């Protein structure tokens, strides 16, 4: 169930679903699994807000366990394509593809709530049953290219070397807000609407 907000206007009452009301304040909620439908919705909202006024920031609240690499990279590419700065605020968690998205916010405007978590790891893939050996080799090569692409983005976003990111992402690596700040993925920890 999506909550409805009722506003008083000069013409009377107007009701919005909560996400439409937040969008009026340039707030986008990226929550749940990153997949094509969700990515299309996020991209459409980014493009709409940028077309509306590209001099104002967009606020992207992130709480995701990750998901599809291609869907996530489409969001990141759009964030980089538009003129508006995209502030990212991690609440709950940014894991896997979520770290790529959250760390791709405008430099100096990447935030995290104090009890949120970050997790980086290498990308996962599979070929399914009954796959030919040559197809498995192609899939393995593609997975290695994808891993390099993601590690380069994380290195660029954090200021760490690709080698360090590669080593740290070998297995699931969970980080607290302070550890995420120290690593360079965020610029500040937000507490009570104040920055630390």
Swiss-Prot record:
Q: Which UniProt keywords apply?
A: Cytoplasm, Hydrolase, Protease, Serine protease
Query: Do the record's keywords include Protease?
Result: yes
MF terms per GO, please? ATP-dependent peptidase activity; ATPase binding; serine-type endopeptidase activity
A Pfam family of this chain: CLP_protease
At the top of the EC hierarchy, this enzyme's class is hydrolase
The catalytic activity of this protein is classed by the Enzyme Commission as: 3.4.21.92
Reactions accelerated catalytically: Hydrolysis of proteins to small peptides in the presence of ATP and magnesium. alpha-casein is the usual test substrate. In the absence of ATP, only oligopeptides shorter than five residues are hydrolyzed (such as succinyl-Leu-Tyr-|-NHMec, and Leu-Tyr-Leu-|-Tyr-Trp, in which cleavage of the -Tyr-|-Leu- and -Tyr-|-Trp bonds also occurs)
Query: Which GO BP terms, alphabetically?
Result: protein quality control for misfolded or incompletely synthesized proteins
This protein's source sits in the domain of life called: Bacteria
Could you name the Gene Ontology cellular component terms for this entry?
Answer: cytoplasm; endopeptidase Clp complex
Query: Which Gene3D superfamilies does the record match to this protein?
Result: 2-enoyl-CoA Hydratase, Chain A, domain 1
Is-annotated flag, keyword Transferase?
Answer: no
Active-site positions, per UniProt?
96, 121
Compartments, record wording: Cytoplasm
Q: How the protein assembles, per its UniProt entry? A: Fourteen ClpP subunits assemble into 2 heptameric rings which stack back to back to give a disk-like structure with a central cavity, resembling the structure of eukaryotic proteasomes.
UniProt record similarity statement: Belongs to the peptidase S14 family.
What is the recorded function of this protein according to its Swiss-Prot or TrEMBL entry?
Cleaves peptides in various proteins in a process that requires ATP hydrolysis. Has a chymotrypsin-like activity. Plays a major role in the degradation of misfolded proteins.
* Name used for this protein in its record: ATP-dependent Clp protease proteolytic subunit
């Amino acid at each position: 169930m999506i909550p409805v907000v009722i506003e008083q206007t000069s013409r009377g009452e107007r009701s919005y679903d909560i996400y439409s009301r937040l969008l009026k304040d340039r707030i986008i909620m990226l929550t749940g699994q990153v997949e094509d439908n969700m990515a299309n919705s996020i991209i459409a909202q980014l493009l709409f807000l940028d077309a509306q006024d590209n001099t104002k920031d967009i606020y992207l609240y992130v709480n995701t366990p990750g998901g599809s690499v291609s869907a996530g990279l489409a969001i990141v590419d759009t964030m980089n394509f538009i003129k508006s700065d995209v502030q990212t605020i991690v609440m709950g968690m940014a894991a896997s593809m979520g770290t790529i998205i959250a760390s791709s916010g405008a430099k100096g405007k990447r935030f995290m709530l104090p009890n949120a978590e970050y997790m980086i790891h290498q990308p996962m893939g599979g070929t399914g049953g009954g796959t030919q050996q040559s197809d498995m080799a192609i899939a393995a090569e593609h997975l290695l290219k994808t891993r390099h692409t993601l590690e380069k983005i994380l290195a660029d976003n954090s200021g760490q070397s690709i080698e360090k990111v590669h080593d740290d992402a070998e297995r699931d690596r969970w980080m607290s807000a302070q550890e995420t700040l120290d690593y360079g993925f965020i610029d500040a920890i937000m507490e009570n609407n104040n920055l630390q």
